[in-house]
A protein has these predicted regions:
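Low-complexity, highly charged intrinsically disordered N-terminal segments
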Residues: 62-65
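Sequence-structural signature of the catalytic-core scaffold of metal-dependent phosphohydrolases
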Residues: 1-26, 38-49, 58, 69, ...
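A short small-residue
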Residues: 49-59, 354-359
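Amphipathic alpha-helical core segments of compact helical bundles
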Residues: 124, 128, 132, 314, ...
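Acidic, low-complexity proline/glycine-rich segments
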Residues: 31-44, 340-346
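C-terminal subdomains that position terminal phosphate/3'-OH groups for nucleotidyl transfer/ligation
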Residues: 281-415
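Acidic, carboxylate-rich catalytic segments that either coordinate divalent cations
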Residues: 1-23, 377-386, 394, 398-431
């Protein structure tokens, strides 16, 4: 069983033996993680990356940056609630445990989408399709002949790419990437297994190049290994991942409804009914009374959204505490939100169904997905040809455009593909 004393580690990736720098008495190590992320260029670039809807014209909807900030706020609240309960249960954890846990979850929430390519989740699908059924298939034999994992590309995953972005030493950069704490890094790894375990769902947590980093994290934090010596690497989740995942799910499920209302995809009555379904009967009665004074429709939807999130956060924290032993033992299955009680369980399922039927399959979202597929295909065709044939005149001009932190002189086919994906996934929708 995992234990909290070992799970909270301020050891930094890539800085394990580094000396000097002095202490920072104004901030904890985990608060430094948060600040380091906020001040980083990759985090700022999230403002020009799509969340669900195309980047706005006259109506401002969520992008990756605003979504990540909101997820971080929810994560902070969940961390505080869970940390308080655990500190009460285990007094030996110390007075800083609650604040440390909250800071870790909040920082991880900021970072959870930093590995996602442009055009939302459709960008991930476009990259996977390129190597599954597109022109990228031509490189499969070479990658496998090198002993590398082709599945790293056919199942391209933003979560695995975030781990690479945050920990890999790119050219001219320091060891350990962002040099974040082990606990913060572990909190973003939703799928702690290799792409060989991805199967039909296509999810995994680390590329072959980051497998050693995953092993180091697991050893330092005491994660439970689920795979045998001769099997693809697989671990039980780091416990705080459940809080990061829940924060993300709460925000995108609820906020997508508000955005859809603002874009007139959902009517006021539809949005109101979806959001109010998360509330208990007594709170719905109070809400109707309050709405006699609040006549602005946008204000009403905003209020309902905040109450729905609050109700979900409070119950999610309780679910974590109730299942803490299963989580620490590595046997908890599903996400925390799958254990919601009524009426929130039915409300969440209905919210997800409406989102799929009316939002994710809406014309504007489908048009963006088609555009992303076309753009990614063109970019990958040109970049991979240039990387394979750098002596060509056009190739040299194209590779000169690639940031110097990416190694365009990679000799392996796997390395060249990773170079192209590092560059493309760091782009914004507008780039």
């Amino acid at each position: 069983m995992m234990n909290w004393q070992q799970l909270l580690s301020d050891r930094r990736v890539g800085a394990e033996t580094r000396q000097g720098g002095g202490g920072d008495y104004a901030r904890s190590e985990f608060e430094r993680d948060y600040d380091r992320l906020v001040f980083s260029p990759p985090f700022r670039r999230l403002q020009n990356k799509t969340q669900v809807f195309p980047l706005p014209g006259n109506v401002f909807v969520h992008n990756r940056l605003t979504h990540s900030l909101e997820v971080s706020c929810v994560g902070r609240s969940l961390g505080n609630m869970v940390g308080t309960a655990l500190q009460r249960k285990y007094p030996d954890l110390g007075i800083d445990f609650r604040s440390s846990l909250s800071a870790i979850v909040s920082a991880a929430c900021l970072a959870h989408d930093m590995g996602n390519p442009p055009f939302g989740h459709s960008g991930e699908r476009a990259i996977g399709a390129y190597f599954t059924e597109g022109n990228g298939l031509q490189w499969r034999e070479a990658v496998e002949a090198e002993g590398h994992r082709w599945s790293d590309f056919t199942h391209f995953e933003g979560n695995a790419n975030a781990l690479r972005l945050l920990t890999h030493q790119f050219l001219g950069r320091r060891a350990g990437g962002f040099a974040l704490s082990y606990s913060t890094i572990a909190s973003i790894i939703k799928y702690p297994y290799s792409s060989e375990c991805a199967g039909g769902h296509g999810k995994f947590g680390f590329f072959q190049t980051e497998e050693a980093t995953m092993r180091d994290l697991a050893e330092e934090l005491g994660l439970i290994r689920l795979s045998g010596d001769d099997e693809p690497l697989r671990y039980a989740r780091y416990p705080l991942v459940y809080l990061v995942e829940a924060s993300d799910d709460i925000c995108y499920q609820v906020m997508d409804i508000e955005d859809a209302y603002k874009l007139n995809i959902l009517s006021y009555e539809e949005a109101k009914n979806i959001l109010s379904a998360f509330l208990d009967e007594s709170e719905r009665v109070y809400m109707e009374d309050l709405f006699r004074d609040i006549t602005d429709a946008n204000e009403r939807i905003g209020y309902l959204r905040s109450r729905a999130i609050n109700a979900l956060v409070e119950e999610t924290a309780q679910i974590f505490i109730e299942h803490e032993e299963q989580i620490l033992s590595g046997v908890f299955s599903g996400g925390l939100l799958s254990k919601l009680s009524e009426p929130r369980n039915s409300a969440m399922k209905h919210c997800s169904q409406v989102a799929w039927d009316r939002i994710y399959r809406s014309k504007m979202v489908i048009d963006m997905e088609l555009a992303g597929h076309r753009i990614f295909t063109s970019l990958l065709d040109k970049l991979l040809h240039a990387l394979a044939h750098p002596e060509h005149l056009y190739s040299k001009a194209l590779l000169d455009r690639v940031s110097s932190q990416y190694n365009v002189h990679e000799t392996s086919c796997y390395g060249r593909i990773q170079c192209a994906l590092d560059y493309i996934s760091g782009m914004t929708d507008l780039y």
